[in-house]
Swiss-Prot record:
Residues 113-470 form the PPM-type phosphatase domain. This is Probable protein phosphatase 2C 37. CDD domains: PP2Cc. Keywords: Hydrolase, Magnesium, Manganese, Metal-binding, Protein phosphatase. Mn(2+) 1 binds at residues 152-153. Residues 57-77, 420-434 have a biased composition (Low complexity). Its cofactor is Mg(2+); Mn(2+). Binds 2 magnesium or manganese ions per subunit. Coiled coil: none annotated. Residues 1-90, 406-434 are annotated as: Disordered. GO terms for molecular function: metal ion binding; protein serine/threonine phosphatase activity.
Amino acid sequence: MVMASAGVNMPGGDGDHPPAAAQECHRLRRRRYVPAAAAASEDGDNSSNGGGEKRSLPASSASPSPSPTSSAASSDCSSDRDDDGCSSTAGAAARRLPLPSGASTAAAVWPVAFGSVSLAGRMRDMEDAVSLRPSFCTWLDGSPMHFFAVFDGHGGPHVSALCREQMHVIVAEEMVAEAAALRQRQPAAMEEEEEERAVAGGAVAELRPGGRAGGGGVRVRARHRAGVPCPLSGQTGAIIGSTAVVALLVRDRLVVSNCGDSRAVLCRAGDPLPLSSDHKGLNPSLSWRGTRVALARGTWGDKTGQSVGPAALLLSGGAHPDRPDEKARIEAVGGRVVYLNGPRVRGILAMSRALGDKYLKPEVICEPDITITVRTVDDECLILASDGMWDVISNETASDVARQCLEDGSPTSGRRAARSGEAASSSAGAPAAAVGQESEPRCYRAAALLARLALGRESSDNISVVVIDLKGRG
């Protein structure tokens, strides 16, 4: 007769084993289920108490496999644990082993490499700024968050330079504050009510790995907060401003925020997918070297002909001054849109949204457009650039050039292309390229070739390009 107790089979005195063998069996089984230190103390207690009452084993104790040197008696008496609430050996071992951290998992599944180039081009002053901040902040589960941005200043470089130094700091502070609030949020049943109140008070974008059932999230709100003071004051400080296109990468989410006419384009399965809309008027045509390129607002379709997003060749078409709702907003606050070489706020600024431009308040606002994209295995690269490149290069061309550079490039050819790009810039009378942090030569090569192509197509503005490789080809 076999009696089960706490998941351990205990043979009775009328079994095949004599009492001495049964006692030895019990002792060996207890050694198998009790940690080494506890087993040693138990043996001492048993010897002093003359084999007194045995201690009960906790249900969560691990049960490693018998060692090869186990005696025949122990092998005869060994058996699996019952289904009376005790876990199996594999389950107990799994609880003891630490799970892989979110950061290591994200880094292995969602690689990120980047490179950037900035050229003054045919402008006398350099007003663009690029910010590359990998792992500037951490996700709630420990995953790294990456910050990439392009700022295109106007009226001077002061606002764009200030954004380069402070924007990622402000975003990190917001992330930390929202993460702390998120840990204390109300139950999930109250989530929708909170979101409705939040939407009524400002733009809300949510980052949720794994959807609603995911293991955490961070909510980023566009808030009215005190601005970072600029060292310039008076009229000089009132007439300067900057655009901003910012990309945050965390795990399988790609968050893009845009204010102005800089742009972010994702290359997915060979097709360009614009992730931002330009906040300036759409010129009727574009020309370089005598070639006119027709532009049109609308949507671009996938290979099935279905409309899936903004126009692939859309160089503008976001919150420009002559868009009906933007024009109504500007006129509601006492401003007006004047058509002077395109629609302009008060006939001065061709954008209806930008950072700075104090003299054009409240017509020109700094509220960004935010898009959230779930990354897929088809995502190849992300391109951030100022209008110095987008004014002469279409989304499709930029996507093709960057993709081919990343697929075919090598560190040696990347450096050679970089040197040739700098030589071409110097020979054209433009300053040499200002190279950003180079974490992947192929990314730098792609950015350098795009900047060189824009320069060859007679771009008249500063040119800044950031190429982010989402495939991890290194």
